[in-house]
Structure formats: structure tokens, C-alpha cells
Amino acid sequence: MTEDIRVRYAPSPTGHLHIGNARTAIFNWLFARHYNGTFVIRIEDTDSARNIADGEKSQLENLAWLGLDWDESPDKPGVYGPYRQSERNEQGIYQEFIDALLASGQAYKSYKTSGQLASEREAQQAAKQAPHYVYEYEGLTNEEREAKYAEFEAQGLKPVVRFRVPEEQVYAWDDIVKGHIEIGAKEVGGDWVIQKADGMPTYNFAVVVDDHLMKISHVLRGDDHVSNTPKQIMIYEALGWDVPKFGHMALIINGETGKKLSKRDENLLQFVEQYKELGYQPQAMVNFIGLLGWSPKGEDEIFSLSEFKEMFDEKRLSKANAKFDQKKLEWVNNQWMRRDTDAVMPQLIQELVNAHLISADDAADKKKWLSEVIKVAGVDGISYTRQIVELVRKPFFELGDITDEMVEYLTSEDGRKVAAAWESTYESLPTDATPADYMSTIRAIQNDLEIKGRNLWNPIRIMTTHEVQGPNLPEMLTLLDKNTVLKTMRDVKEKYLA
């Protein structure tokens, strides 16, 4: 592309970073960086009643955690600021263009009460008409309309400002993702509000003013914004401005239910911060989210953010709904943890501290031992770092209960023979025995007693760890304190084999 690329991610600070919003931010970032453009963050905080205290901070922190950077934002202002809509409104930026539309007759003040609007909707439903706003100044001159304004103001009524929708107009654009789209003016529901009674601009008006003044060239956003686009094009045309290129990305749906992701669906984690707290890796989150509605060439599925940037092609954005597959996310995260376990190790150790398996001071002193424990336990079987806690809890920090099934293994004829042989040979081994030494000892017991398989391994594991499954036993034994293991064996022997 030869034109100057300027794209934006414009969240509302009404909540934390949702997976869908993260995808919007990631694709806009990729588009900007691939074409050496500018990535802008603008905060759309006009809905003060719904804004939460740390909404903006959370959004920016989680974007940074994902590895995204930006060129302009509230915390990195450029020449097109302010970058919060509330601040832009205070400066009168929107009012200037509201006044221009009022002066040209393309907008007007409406004083209808909520009761009047409800009555109109009921009448339209009774007449089986599509819901639409009924223009109240039909046939009046400008002077007569102004007189009506004064009359309503005298009654203490506060107006909203509505845009006068051209009735027969068709709004068309060539969507970057969906191709050619046409929507008739009649489909937008009649004259719509561009300024609320409290003086705040509505979303579809403010976003146009901001995108124009910030010189946004491309607008990449979710499919649910398609219905907003004709309203926005109306404002561009009414003010004589060039319309940016729009691209509407496919909806993200729940892979199990097939329904659009809903923030009210508590059965599926949908916020980046939730995955961060569980120990998902930022590279994995970007990797997974980047494949929701975009497909690379070839069969590979594991990509870094920089690799995405190099191969990004907006033409490969999909029209089909993107399935949020929790199992796929777990697999992707596991791939990233296995790719560089040493890099994830501090986080894995911290999980053990957080779970109170070990104190922070002891963790610092035993860092090498903990690293070996985690490597023996293996990250292959976990989807995120918090799961390491249960993987290593037994037998490295706690002993589980011996079940009836385990007792049967121990007290069988073969079990008693194996337990006795294992206790005596283990005690004779040096404290610095290697995995090979332990394996050789177990093989010798197998050959001497002619017992193998579960009848061999289960009694040994039960005597040593109170478990019948777990990490590689010879490797694990090198990490367990010998005196502790001997005490465990003697306790088992006294309780079940005496």
C-alpha cells in the first residue's frame, strides 16, 4: 500500500479486555505494523454511567502484556489528541460539528419524551410497521421550528439532537472482509440521535468526528458494527468528508454451542486477564486469537507476533464465523510452554509459592531443585501454569491416601515380595544414586522375583509415593529426600504389611 495507514483500537472503559476486543486490537496492530503505518488507541468513555474505575488501565496493561505497542494514545499523546472522548467533548470538538449540522438543516433538536416515543412504537407495532422515528416538524419552516424549540425550552425540556436521514438513500461500501455491501436508509430506523440530552455525543457520531480528525484510513472491527456503518457514512457525507475503508471481521462464536460469545456466558472464560491469571502465555494468547477469523498459508499453526506481522494479509481475513475452541487454546498454550520451559520456569515456581506449597524464601533457596521437580513432572500434561500445582503436589510436597485398590496390590503375594525387596535394596543405595542406578535396581528385583508390569511397579510406587501413577519413577527418586522416603516405606509396612 502506498497511502499512509492509520488505524485505531477504540475501547470503552466499561470492562476488562474481552477476547473479541483483543482480536480487534491485534488485527489493527498487525495491519499497521505490516504496512509501516500508525496504530492509535482512543478511549471512548462517553458512557460515564457504565465506565469502571480501572477500565482504561486494565485495557492498556493487558494489551501491553499481549506484546502490543502503540504510537498514539492517552499515555502517549500525538498531534491529534486528546485521545479520550470525554476530554474531546469538554473542548467542544463535537459541538462544532453538531452546530454545523443544525445550521444546515441536516440535524434538528427533538424534545419528545420517553412516553411519547413509547406510544409511537406501540402504534407502529399495532400497524405492523417497522420501528422508526416519526419526524415532528414536517411542513414547518425554519422559523416555525425555532419557535417550537423555544416553546419546549420554556417548559424546561432538554432536547436530543437527531440526524435527518435521507429517506431514499442507499449506503454502499466495499468491505475489506465481506466485499460489497449496500444498506438502505430505511433500514436504520429513521432519524437517529447524534447528541444526548446531557450534551454527550452518541457513539456513531463521535466515532466519525474522531476518525476524520485523527486521519484514520482504515477501520477494522467486528461484524456486529456492520449496522452502524450506514449511519457513520451519513455523517461523513453530510460533513463533506472522505469515508475511510471499512472491514468487518467475522463473529467469534462458542465452539461448543455455536452461539455468539456473550459476556454473560459464565461457562467460558472470555477476558484476557482471566487467562493471564491462570498462567496462559501472552505469545499463546496472541497466537490463538490471531487465528480467530484469519488463516495463514500452509499447515503451521504456531506463530509469534513478529511472524504474524510479516505474513499478515488482510485478504485472508475470513467471512465465516470463528469458533472459540477452548481445547485448541489449551493446546496452543502447551506448545508455547514446551517450546521454552526454562523461560516459563519462574512463573511455574511462583505458582507453587502462591499455592503455599513452599515459601518464597525456600523457593529462592531451592530454585534448582524446584526446576528439576517441574521438569521431571513435565509440562506436557498441563495447559497453563497454575496446573503445575496439582502435578507436583504429590509426592514432592504431600502424600496422598492409600486406596483399597492400592492395599490389594501391596498385600497380594507378589506385592509383599516386591515391597520387601524394594525396601532393602533402596536402603542400600547411595544418596547420590542416579536414575540409571534406580532403574538397574528395579530390573534386578524383576529378574530375581520374576514379577513384572503392574505387579512390580505398583507396589514400588505405593511404598515410595502413595501413588500408582506419576512422573518417571527413577528420575523422581533422585529428587526425593532418602530419609523421608525410608520413613514413608516403614509407615506403609507397619500399617499394611506387618
From Swiss-Prot:
It is an enzyme of class 6 (ligase). ATP binds at residue 263. Belongs to the class-I aminoacyl-tRNA synthetase family. Glutamate--tRNA ligase type 1 subfamily. It comes from the Bacteria. InterPro entries: aa-tRNA-synth_I_cd-bd (IPR045462), aa-tRNA-synth_I_codon-bd_sub2 (IPR020751), aa-tRNA-synth_I_CS (IPR001412), aa_tRNA-synth_I_cd-bd_sf (IPR008925), Glu-tRNA-ligase_bac/mito (IPR004527), Glu/Gln-tRNA-synth (IPR000924), Glu/Gln-tRNA-synth_Ib_cat-dom (IPR020058), GluQ/Sye (IPR049940). A motif ('KMSKS' region) lies at residues 260-264. A motif ('HIGH' region) lies at residues 11-21. Catalyzes the attachment of glutamate to tRNA(Glu) in a two-step reaction: glutamate is first activated by ATP to form Glu-AMP and then transferred to the acceptor end of tRNA(Glu). It comes from Leuconostoc mesenteroides subsp. mesenteroides (strain ATCC 8293 / DSM 20343 / BCRC 11652 / CCM 1803 / JCM 6124 / NCDO 523 / NBRC 100496 / NCIMB 8023 / NCTC 12954 / NRRL B-1118 / 37Y). Signal peptide: none annotated. One of its GO terms (biological process) is glutamyl-tRNA aminoacylation. Its main location: cytoplasm. It is found in: Cytoplasm. PANTHER family: GLUTAMATE--TRNA LIGASE (PTHR43311), GLUTAMATE--TRNA LIGASE, MITOCHONDRIAL-RELATED (PTHR43311:SF2). It catalyses: tRNA(Glu) + L-glutamate + ATP = L-glutamyl-tRNA(Glu) + AMP + diphosphate. This is Glutamate--tRNA ligase.
